[in-house]
């Protein structure tokens, strides 16, 4: 499958394996990847990843590991053992944590992509101030994205508004995975920094994470095809 055809990652906003599989029944694994987050993975464990892989979907395991270097690296390698396409950590865990993860993945000859979360898309300046960072979100994103690149990871999660800045700052050989994507007319839900799929791709995003607009659609396949057409 060409990477360019798999720019959409469908977030499986489901509590059970049954519900997740019902969603993917209506999706085409040649047109998208899927994301398994904390709620679904905590309910169902590794079996849901295996079931999705049996349906030929590549899985982004979105667990945002954040711990001491050795513990985080062990968790990342455990995810890689599941054969997931991508896994992530929190960049705020620091350089040593991220470098240790990269070293362990290389030592194990894993092909799993490793990216980092910079600033959660639900956080604005006041939220950062509450945790002792008197800084605009975009400045913290830039700082953590540079650290992620220097640590040898494959990319970062960032909002579309930051994608253009990061592309200029870091260069082309770096994935920018963008949540907070909503097609025209969609509800913003709990994402503060949102943008349309077309604009996100124009701004430099390589992968778009889209959940409820697809999974809650009357016809998820048609919604996915509509989004793909909008960014073609």
Curated annotation (Swiss-Prot):
Catalytic activity, per the record? orotidine 5'-phosphate + H(+) = UMP + CO2
Q: Name one GO biological process term.
A: 'de novo' pyrimidine nucleobase biosynthetic process
Q: Its Enzyme Commission number?
A: 4.1.1.23
Q: InterPro entries of this UniProt entry?
A: Aldolase_TIM, OMPdecase, OMPdecase_AS, OMPdecase_bac, OMPdeCOase_dom, RibuloseP-bd_barrel
Keyword entries, A-Z? Decarboxylase, Lyase, Pyrimidine biosynthesis
Any one Gene Ontology MF annotation carried by this entry is:
orotidine-5'-phosphate decarboxylase activity
Q: Does the keyword Lyase apply?
A: yes
Which residues does substrate bind? 13, 35, 62-71, 121, 182, 191, 211-212
Per the record, its GO cellular-component terms are: cytosol
Q: Which SMART domains match?
A: OMPdecase (SM00934)
Indicate the residues that form the catalytic site: 64
Q: In which pathway does it act?
A: Pyrimidine metabolism; UMP biosynthesis via de novo pathway; UMP from orotate: step 2/2
Annotated HAMAP family? OMPdecase_type1_B
Subunit arrangement?
A: Homodimer.
Family per similarity comment: Belongs to the OMP decarboxylase family. Type 1 subfamily.
This molecule's function is given as: Catalyzes the decarboxylation of orotidine 5'-monophosphate (OMP) to uridine 5'-monophosphate (UMP).
Name by which UniProt lists this protein:
Orotidine 5'-phosphate decarboxylase
Q: Which organism is it from?
A: Acinetobacter baumannii (strain AB0057)
Gene from which the chain derives: pyrF
